[in-house]
Amino acid sequence: MSIDEAKEGGGGPAMSPRAFALAHQRDRGSFVGCSRIADYEVLGKLGEGTFGEVHRARSRKTGALVALKKIIMHNERDGFPITALREIKLLKLLSHKNVLRLEEMAIEHPPRTDKRTRPIVYMVTPYMDHDLSGLLDNPSVRFTEPQVKCYLLQLLEGLKYLHANHILHRDMKAANLLINNKGVLQIADFGLARHYEGDIPQPGKGSGEGKRDYTSLVVTRWYRPPELLMHLKRYTTAIDMWGVGCVFAEMLEGKPVLQGESDLHQLELVWDLCGTPSEETMPGWRTLPGGQAFSSKPRPGNLARRFEKHGPVVISLLKELFKLDWRSRINAIDALNHPYFRTAPLPALPGDLPTFEESHEFDRRKFQDRKAALPPAPKGGTVGRGAVVNSQGPDTGFSGRDGYGGGGRNGANGGRYPPYHRGPPPGDERVPSWHSARGLPPRPPMPADYHGSGPMDHTDGYRDRPPRRGPGGPPGGGGGPSNVDTYIPSYDRDGPAPRREDWRRRDDWDDRRGGVDRDRRRPEYDVRSRDSRTRSRTRSRSPVRDRDRGRDRDAYARR
């Protein structure tokens, strides 16, 4: 039974939140609850990043290998990260062979001598030997067509389950697909996932229409569909299916196929692949916020020519996954029934797939060291390959999310493929898992209906939240919930947490007084983070200086 069916109670009255949660509990034995970190023997570090650290560990009770994901709170005043809360909530509800399973939570209490007051929280999941991005980066790995079909089938089965239960993943990419040496693929990283309202996909009906608005600041740029690049907010499961198309093409080519350096460049690459939009191929695209300033020259797509060597059945499935019209884009149910999976060679069984050496962050560095040991290439590049330009050096690889890394894509995959631009897509997106040294994304363009004379306030309706109201509240005095997505994803870089909004507003106020240089270097410490016992009083009437009672008395006497 799906979440929607349980919520509606089979046509009866709406269920309360508690009844809804109780109806979707997994078997009591499947989620242990909380244990101590001492119950695990830590074996090694798999990766680290903004969200936390991931370690390989062994349970002292069962002997099973697990992955421990340490959840880092960059600013304890902000509380537990909302991305972690949402991920834990969803993973506790979900149970499918192709969805990463949350076994339990583990707690590490700081010693009494430690100044930290809050315990450290770990998510405990089954250990997976690889992620798909890491396998593609391993020069010793070569995917066969039955292997590609096997992985794609499992991905579609997992998405079919998620969408049938009203879950949008919203970050579909190769780095978030974990694979073990038994050939099992599991969807991971639910930090951006959420429950969605509307109809679930039906056979032969595409992805349908959205029912409410959500933030468009989701999905890593190289896997982001054109409707999100044009700031559609009422989107559907079609955004995940576009990501499936990107992953499918990546397995075929051995590298990401749409490597945009900005949102505008990403759209141009989409138009190159699928053709420029029209009312026939993408109805209503002109009404999207990003479609009103569209000025690209009309051109046909090159998808069929680009993937010609893979055959007409592959091209047929890719065209369905890369449809510009999100309403008619193929859903997971129909994709599973596509002739591609019934055409020889047939998909391999997971147990028949070969095993590979581990492909995590530190293993990628090993792959890079192997390449570094090669003799210098001639000026034009290694024979059979072009020169490598704009190299970013070793990639850090781990995003801090469920994927243990996704990193360091070199696009060579055993030397079979031509080179491509190395390095992450700069600009406006979430921190991708294959690169941690990223900055905050630039703000998306202002909405077309903005006619103000001053700078736009980027903290309210700009991110799918209702505009701020005065003391009178919303018009009409209604207090009901607004039909918007209240979740704003985190875009933290791998380093200190960004300044809070109150700092930004204070700086803006100081700027208006003309007395503050916005680019001045801030102190290396943060007064707010100091221990309360050493925090200075906030009502000091004068600058800190040596007190001299006699001098002060003489000064007042002269007045």
From Swiss-Prot:
Compositional bias, Basic and acidic residues, is annotated for: 359-372, 457-467, 491-534, 543-559
Q: Where is the composition biased (Gly residues)?
A: 400-414
At the top level, the lineage of the source is Eukaryota
Which keywords label this protein? ATP-binding, Kinase, Nucleotide-binding, Nucleus, Serine/threonine-protein kinase, Transferase
EC code: 2.7.11.22, 2.7.11.23
Q: Main localization of the protein?
A: nucleus
Q: Which Gene3D superfamilies match?
A: Phosphorylase Kinase, domain 1 (3.30.200.20), Transferase(Phosphotransferase) domain 1 (1.10.510.10)
Q: Which InterPro entries match?
A: CDK, Kinase-like_dom_sf, Prot_kinase_dom, Protein_kinase_ATP_BS, Ser/Thr_kinase_AS
Which residues of this protein are catalytic? D171
From the Swiss-Prot or TrEMBL record, state where the protein is found: Nucleus
If you read the UniProt record, what top EC class would you report for this enzyme, in one word? transferase
Q: Which GO cellular component terms are attached?
A: chromatin; nucleus; P-TEFb complex; P-TEFb-cap methyltransferase complex
Q: Which residues form the Protein kinase domain?
A: 40-341
Identify the residues that bind ATP: L46, G47, E48, G49, T50, F51, G52, E53, V54, K69
Which residues lie within the region annotated Disordered?
359-559
GO molecular function list = ATP binding; cyclin-dependent protein serine/threonine kinase activity; protein serine kinase activity; RNA polymerase II CTD heptapeptide repeat kinase activity
Q: Does the keyword Nucleus apply?
A: yes
Q: Name one GO biological process term.
A: transcription elongation by RNA polymerase II
The family this protein is said to belong to: Belongs to the protein kinase superfamily. CMGC Ser/Thr protein kinase family. CDC2/CDKX subfamily.
Function, as annotated: Serine/threonine-protein kinase involved in transcription regulation. Phosphorylates the mus-8/ubc2 ubiquitin-conjugating enzyme (E2), leading to monoubiquitination of histone H2B and the silencing of telomeric-associated genes. Also required for histone H3 methylation. Necessary for the recovery from pheromone-induced growth arrest in the cell cycle G1 phase.
- Output this protein's name: Serine/threonine-protein kinase bur1
> Which species is the source of this protein?
Neurospora crassa (strain ATCC 24698 / 74-OR23-1A / CBS 708.71 / DSM 1257 / FGSC 987)
Gene that this polypeptide is encoded by: stk-1
